[in-house]
Amino acid sequence: MTNFSSSPPIAFGDLQGCHAAYRQLFDTLAPAADTPLWFAGDLVNRGPASLATLREIVALGERAIAVLGNHDLHLLAVAAGIRTLKPGDTIGEILDAPDADDLIEWVRHRPFAHFERGMLMVHAGLLPQWDAALALELADELQRALRAPNWRDTLRSLYGNDPNCWSPDLKHADRLRVAFNAFTRIRFCTPEGAMEFRANGGPAAAPAGYLPWFDAPGRKTADVTVVFGHWAALGLMLRENLVALDSGCVWGNRLSAVRLADDPAARVVTQVACERCGAADE
């Protein structure tokens, strides 16, 4: 991993093509040129300017650390012919762009997890049996598979809900699928780590027998700060070792960024309103 400065990184929540809100937030923050910029996934889709958003993040070069979210992977799957565009998708402009191939390649080479300064960033979450080392090992397996020449076949095999819980005995596609779903889809799980994929409300709406993944008893990543997005109904949430960043910009709420100081008490939140996102073209 690359360290550009001793400055704490700034982590952004799900942009989802909300380019105007991102520009406003970036300009408000006015980060120094060497400040690392982290993005918790879902750079694109549903917002009105997915193409402009993606191009801008790509242009940041190695300064930008962006993990893969479910909408970013949906873009790859549509580009690969594995899935089709759905109502509400706004990624068609990326697929039709003259630089589409370069943009797709950039997305395909993003990581599923990033660990630095004692902080682990993923898009959605982690299973309770994983410590940081195992999470990074699984992320690396997924990353290498998606960067291989047969990545389309691999991506096709990753979609599905089963198995829905971790076992060290899992192999091949089953092992990768569980990791894929935890990194990019999880919100709720049982205390034993069995994932549930239908519920998308806040913690109070947890199905019977389930709880937010980060509250699973004995979670082995409780000793690091986990930074994640994905869960708009949860909203911005900061605990000593937890930073939830998706505050529902694409739904007309707010876009959030957090300056990730090593001391939790020194972490600074900056937000902008997102009234225009999803309502009209920029």
UniProtKB/Swiss-Prot annotation:
PANTHER family: CYTOCHROME C5, PTHR40942. It holds the Pfam family Metallophos. It comes from Burkholderia pseudomallei (strain K96243). The gene is apaH. GO terms for molecular function: bis(5'-nucleosyl)-tetraphosphatase (symmetrical) activity. HAMAP family: ApaH. It is an enzyme of class 3 (hydrolase). This is Bis(5'-nucleosyl)-tetraphosphatase, symmetrical. The keyword Transport does not apply. Belongs to the Ap4A hydrolase family. Its EC number is 3.6.1.41. Keywords: Hydrolase. It catalyses: P(1),P(4)-bis(5'-adenosyl) tetraphosphate + H2O = 2 ADP + 2 H(+). InterPro entries: ApaH (IPR004617), Calcineurin-like_PHP_ApaH (IPR004843), Metallo-depent_PP-like (IPR029052). CDD domains: MPP_ApaH. The keyword Hydrolase applies. Hydrolyzes diadenosine 5',5'''-P1,P4-tetraphosphate to yield ADP.
